[in-house]
């Protein structure tokens, strides 16, 4: 036998060339599986070397063709590896871009909120700490006050209108009244013609409120012109005016009483007509609404021949009252009987109509059956 028949098959197996590209886990696994298959085939061929031996083709050619390393398997796996690598790179790039955009957006929003908060922060000024800045308080008192003056100067040719005058707070006055600010006293030229006794008396009479309690009486007394007008008013004239108003009111009262009160001198016929027309007389106004039975009683009295005596206005006697009560009771009984009779008669008429309708229906049905 030839020497090569006893040579192991793995000596003739060509070694694959070394590759520089990295393989994925799946590709390595496939290669490991392929190598295990090759080893199984080699072991089988060791024991059965005569199966793959063909002398016509020169030795171990069939076995060599069967176990030749084929690069087609690797070339077929390359597109899947390239596709997976490209997807992995694309997803990683997309995640990086999204994270960058998100971080930029968060930083921009944070900067915006910080700027808004910085603008909203209260800026403390000197007026918030007046006890630390006394010069600011002094400058604040000197402001431009608007005062209304009317009428204007006599020398001005422009039409009379409200003018505006600028001054200090110490000279502030409106419509003849002066207002004191704190405990500051006004100049003495405004109060040259007023005595302190008069000021005190006026302040006691006027009962000035708590707003002026801290101020001396010289600061809130009216000007000379208004003071003179108030002193010129005589309290006696005010009392006379009040008396005239009261007298006018008392004079108009009798006319109102005549229109509102009940006139006992009117005739009884007029009284009955007003009662029938629905007007309520003041004599019965306390009872509320006038009942219909009262109107019937007046009618009954007139039918009995009773009339009111205009001179004596004498009431009814006992006999007349008994007769009136008996007649009224009889009328009430007759009214109730009449009402019951009418109700029964109406019900009887309705019953008769229903019976007649039933009879007519039965007769019409009988005639139709006969036909």
From Swiss-Prot:
Lineage: Eukaryota, Metazoa, Chordata, Craniata, Vertebrata
Subcellular localization(s) per the UniProt record: Nucleus
General function of this protein: Functions as a GC-rich promoter-specific transactivating transcription factor.
GO molecular function: DNA binding; RNA binding
Pfam families: Vasculin
InterPro entries, A to Z: Vasculin_fam
Keywords for this protein: Activator, DNA-binding, Nucleus, Transcription, Transcription regulation
Chief localization: nucleus
The encoding gene: gpbp1
Keyword Transcription (UniProt): yes
Name the record gives this protein: Vasculin
Species whose genome carries this gene: Xenopus laevis (African clawed frog)
A single GO BP: regulation of DNA-templated transcription
GO cellular component: nucleus
Residues annotated as transmembrane: none
Family affiliation: Belongs to the vasculin family.
